[in-house]
Amino acid sequence: MKCPYCGYPDSRVIDSRPTDDNTAIRRRRECLKCGKRFTTYEKVEQLPILVIKKDNRRELYDKEKILRGMIKACEKRPVPIKVLEEITDEIDRKIVNSMVREITSAEIGEMVMEKLKSVDEVAYVRFASVYRQFKDINTFMDELKKLLKENEEKKQKE
């Protein structure tokens, strides 16, 4: 590894350990010429994931887009941003670990709705109304009735 101080092409590894999130290896190195120490990170190169949109266009997967959509759905709701970031990270890990090169926006949307439903039902309905493109009030009411029915069934089990 080239020394960032003197440019010498060789160094030795003094310490090597995984990062806190286990996504990279942190290495402390020492230049064999000037003796200065520096840190490098070794990380697996991720292949790009493409999202297939409803109109069959393809665009690069962007984890931040999931977070932005949930923030919008949770506007004026008592949902901490930390919770939304954790959900985003969980969905992102699921997508990346699936090793797929392409995923539909529908699959991502369903994952988001599944998580939002357990966090905040109002946010869930807001997200669903945009994601599922509710055409009129009847479609909206159908979703609310379904949610109410699920809640009743949940209460009966308890």
From Swiss-Prot:
It comes from the Bacteria. Residues 49-139 form the ATP-cone domain. The keyword Transcription applies. Binds 1 zinc ion. The keyword Amino-acid biosynthesis does not apply. One of its GO terms (biological process) is negative regulation of DNA-templated transcription. Its cofactor is Zn(2+). GO terms for molecular function: ATP binding; DNA binding; zinc ion binding. PROSITE patterns: ATP_CONE. A zinc finger (unnamed) spans 3-34. Keywords: ATP-binding, DNA-binding, Metal-binding, Nucleotide-binding, Repressor, Transcription, Transcription regulation, Zinc, Zinc-finger. It holds the Pfam family Zn_ribbon_NrdR. InterPro entries: ATP-cone_dom, NrdR-like_N, RNR_NrdR-like. Belongs to the NrdR family. Negatively regulates transcription of bacterial ribonucleotide reductase nrd genes and operons by binding to NrdR-boxes. This is Transcriptional repressor NrdR. It comes from Caldanaerobacter subterraneus subsp. tengcongensis (strain DSM 15242 / JCM 11007 / NBRC 100824 / MB4) (Thermoanaerobacter tengcongensis).
